């Protein structure tokens, strides 16, 4: 009687194994309907991430806000808690507040000079920094009530941004 029961169990296990073997040969593994995490799109510039307002950060398209992206791109950056917003520009993170001239930038602050631009002195100062050797950030102080302002460049690798009103600070993005 035990022998019959043992043969029945072995036969049952053999049939189950044959069914799994046959189903594996004729029915290949199917992809899941929804992946756990969607694949990240690689990019070099923001234009590569046109869809849904994404920006290129660290070589991948992401919806990361500008402040988080700056912290991701620039390891060890110390942002002043008063700085609560920034905007993406093609080559820079542009902050709504700026560095204090007495900050750790110290001697690295280079006064480029007074600029006259009736449209946007900030954009002009930014483009000058992008073409100035060693410039890692810029600041534009508009002279009250005029279309002129002072443009400053900075050369420190990890700026510690300090709060100050009526000026704009920007640091370069790591664009691949």
From Swiss-Prot:
Keywords: Early protein, Host cell membrane, Host membrane, Membrane, Transmembrane, Transmembrane helix, Virion
Recorded topology in the membrane: Single-pass membrane protein
Cystine pairings recorded for this chain: none
Compartments where found: Virion membrane; Host cell membrane
Topology Intravirion: residue spans: 1
One GO CC term on file: membrane
Segments passing through the bilayer: 2-22
Keyword Transcription regulation applies: no
Topology Virion surface: residue spans: 23-176
Induction or repression: Early structural protein.
Entry similarity comment: Belongs to the asfivirus envelope protein p22 family.
The protein's name in its UniProt record: Envelope protein 167
Organism expressing this protein natively: African swine fever virus (isolate Warthog/Namibia/Wart80/1980)
């Amino acid at each position: 009687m035990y022998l019959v029961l043992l043969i029945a169990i072995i036969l049952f296990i053999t049939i189950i194994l044959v069914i799994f073997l046959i189903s594996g040969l004729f029915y290949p593994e199917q992809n899941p309907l929804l992946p756990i995490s969607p694949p990240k799109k690689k990019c070099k510039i923001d234009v590569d991430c046109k869809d849904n307002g994404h920006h290129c950060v660290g070589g991948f398209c992401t919806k990361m806000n500008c402040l988080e992206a700056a912290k991701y791109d620039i390891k060890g950056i110390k942002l002043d808690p008063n700085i609560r917003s920034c905007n993406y520009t093609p080559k820079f993170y542009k902050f709504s507040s700026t560095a204090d001239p007495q900050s750790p930038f110290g001697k690295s602050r280079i006064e480029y000079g007074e600029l006259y631009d009736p449209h946007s002195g900030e954009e002009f100062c930014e483009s000058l920094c992008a073409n100035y050797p060693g410039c890692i950030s810029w600041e534009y102080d508009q002279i009250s009530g005029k279309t002129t302002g002072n443009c400053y460049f900075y050369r420190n690798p990890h700026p510690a941004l300090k709060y100050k009103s009526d000026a704009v600070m920007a640091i370069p993005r790591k664009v691949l």
